[in-house]
């Protein structure tokens, strides 16, 4: 008993590592992209408008398909005490955005930590330690864990579901699986379904017992999402059912681009897992890892059949594959036939390579949110007592602008699209894309208050450290009206 307590105490710094790394990512890249918009705006509206649903953003900008409010409701509930205190202290709403994202990040890290505990039980302390170090040094897992993407909200539920599966707590596994599949991401039926089929094949669970939990879980979760989301959307809807029909049956997701069949395997997984990918085959020396590999790789293989692909779509597999990589690291560390320095150098070196890749990616990503930077500059450059009517164009709205950044209650912020040239002159300020020719249209009526740069990529430069340059160009311009329209 004393040994277990001592081991638990020694593991707490690893939790601190995960939280610290996630916080660094959050602070360096505090703004968001359009993919995160619905959940972020919905959480804002739940916090600040509460039952005044007419003021909610999704009524004006509903998006291509409806999304569920289940995730924003949970995030808002946990964020509300801190946000309330910040509002009493009259602190900028921008910091509420950080709190909201931080709460989501803690939810994901809590799932990682619970999974780590089970890894410690089944594979030993060394594998658990390596799992934490690998997870903390991978860019995409830490970068995305605070981002209000539907996939990340689902990840916060998938992690405890997978932990329950490893613990053979079948009832909890089925209930969590039903909740995340029906409420958040229907494609997770492939990942969690393969895990369930594997369990049935191994005769650890009977079909009758599965149905005894799956039927009430499915009905209850479906009823919950339909009831909650129909209230907020004001019509009868099962959001994830609509998304499933749109993306899978109609294959409309292809409108946002397509990738080759094996893209997840040769591009997404290497970028997501970093140098740790090389240790996964070594982890396969332990037959216990086969049960981890089959659902994860099977999910990626099946999901590859859909033409539209993004790395975040398979982020659920990263922690599971990290367990295999951690087992591979442990295999090397325990290989007595090799000199200890060689073993330690291989394992430590791959962690350092991950850190270098993460630091580079995070630095470049910092320049990817010109819309958020523009909103910050607007509030710094324009006195708060000024009468401001700001128009925000699509490019700005997609690269960092959110309701949390609308910090002046006396100003008016407008994201209306297809506004005519004459009507644009009614705005005191215009935040627009720096497309050649567009700012020139306002040369006689506006002045450039600020130009905001964004990244166009990186280029190799061996003459400096770090050996690359971030290529920047003006992405947005902030215009201020000179004269009032006649």
Swiss-Prot record:
It is an enzyme of class 2 (transferase). GO terms for molecular function: dolichyl-P-Man:Man(7)GlcNAc(2)-PP-dolichol alpha-1,6-mannosyltransferase. Its main location: endoplasmic reticulum. It comes from the Eukaryota. It catalyses: an alpha-D-Man-(1->2)-alpha-D-Man-(1->2)-alpha-D-Man-(1->3)-[alpha-D-Man-(1->2)-alpha-D-Man-(1->3)-alpha-D-Man-(1->6)]-beta-D-Man-(1->4)-beta-D-GlcNAc-(1->4)-alpha-D-GlcNAc-diphospho-di-trans,poly-cis-dolichol + a di-trans,poly-cis-dolichyl beta-D-mannosyl phosphate = an alpha-D-Man-(1->2)-alpha-D-Man-(1->2)-alpha-D-Man-(1->3)-[alpha-D-Man-(1->2)-alpha-D-Man-(1->3)-[alpha-D-Man-(1->6)]-alpha-D-Man-(1->6)]-beta-D-Man-(1->4)-beta-D-GlcNAc-(1->4)-alpha-D-GlcNAc-diphospho-di-trans,poly-cis-dolichol + a di-trans,poly-cis-dolichyl phosphate + H(+). PANTHER family: DOL-P-MAN:MAN(7)GLCNAC(2)-PP-DOL ALPHA-1,6-MANNOSYLTRANSFERASE, GLYCOSYLTRANSFERASE. This is Dol-P-Man:Man(7)GlcNAc(2)-PP-Dol alpha-1,6-mannosyltransferase. It comes from Mus musculus. The lineage of its organism: Eukaryota, Metazoa, Chordata, Craniata, Vertebrata.
């Amino acid at each position: 008993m004393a040994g277990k307590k001592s081991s638990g105490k020694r593991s707490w710094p690893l939790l601190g590592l995960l939280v610290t790394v996630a916080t660094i990512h959050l602070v360096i890249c505090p703004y968001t992209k359009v993919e995160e918009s619905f959940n972020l705006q919905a959480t804002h509206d739940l916090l600040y408008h509460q039952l005044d649903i007419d003021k909610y953003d999704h009524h004006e900008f509903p998006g291509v398909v409806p999304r569920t409010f289940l995730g924003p409701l949970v995030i808002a509930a946990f964020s509300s005490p801190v946000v309330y205190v910040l509002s009493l202290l009259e602190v900028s709403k921008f910091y509420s955005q950080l709190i909201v994202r931080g709460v989501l990040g803690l939810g994901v890290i809590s799932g990682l930590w619970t999974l780590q505990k089970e890894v410690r039980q089944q594979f030993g302390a060394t594998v658990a330690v390596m799992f934490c170090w690998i997870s903390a040094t991978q860019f995409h897992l830490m970068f995305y864990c605070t981002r209000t993407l539907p996939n990340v909200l689902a990840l916060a539920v998938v992690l405890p579901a997978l932990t329950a599966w490893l613990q053979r707590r079948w009832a909890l596994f089925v209930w969590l699986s039903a909740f995340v599949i029906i409420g958040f991401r229907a494609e997770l039926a492939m990942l969690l379904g393969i895990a369930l089929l594997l369990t049935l094949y191994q005769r650890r669970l009977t079909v009758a017992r599965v149905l005894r939990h799956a039927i009430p879980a499915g009905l209850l979760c479906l009823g919950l999402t339909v009831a909650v989301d129909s209230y907020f959307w004001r019509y009868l809807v099962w959001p994830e059912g609509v998304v499933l029909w749109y993306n899978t049956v109609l294959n409309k997701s292809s409108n946002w681009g397509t990738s080759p069949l094996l893209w997840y395997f040769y591009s997404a997984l290497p970028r997501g897992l970093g140098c740790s990918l090389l240790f996964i085959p070594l982890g396969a020396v332990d037959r216990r890892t086969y049960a981890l590999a089959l659902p994860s790789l099977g999910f990626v293989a099946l999901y590859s059949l859909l033409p539209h692909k993004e790395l975040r779509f398979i982020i659920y597999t990263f922690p599971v594959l990290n367990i295999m990589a951690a087992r591979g690291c442990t295999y090397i560390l325990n290989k007595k036939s090799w000199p200890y320095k060689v073993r330690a150098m291989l394992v430590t070196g791959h962690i350092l390579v991950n850190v270098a890749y993460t630091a580079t990616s995070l630095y470049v990503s910092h320049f990817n949110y010109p819309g958020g930077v523009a909103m910050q500059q607007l509030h710094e450059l324009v006195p708060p007592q000024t009468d401001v009517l700001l128009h925000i164009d699509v490019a700005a709205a997609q690269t960092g602008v959110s309701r949390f950044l609308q910090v002046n209650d006396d100003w008016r912020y407008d994201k209306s699209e297809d506004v005519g040239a004459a009507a644009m002159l009614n705005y005191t300020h215009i935040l627009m894309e720096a497309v050649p020719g567009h700012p020139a249209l306002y040369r006689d009526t506006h002045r450039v208050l600020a130009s905001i740069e964004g990244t166009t990529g990186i280029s190799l430069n061996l003459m400096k450290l770090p050996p690359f340059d971030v290529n920047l160009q003006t992405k947005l311009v902030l215009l201020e009206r000179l004269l009032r329209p006649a």
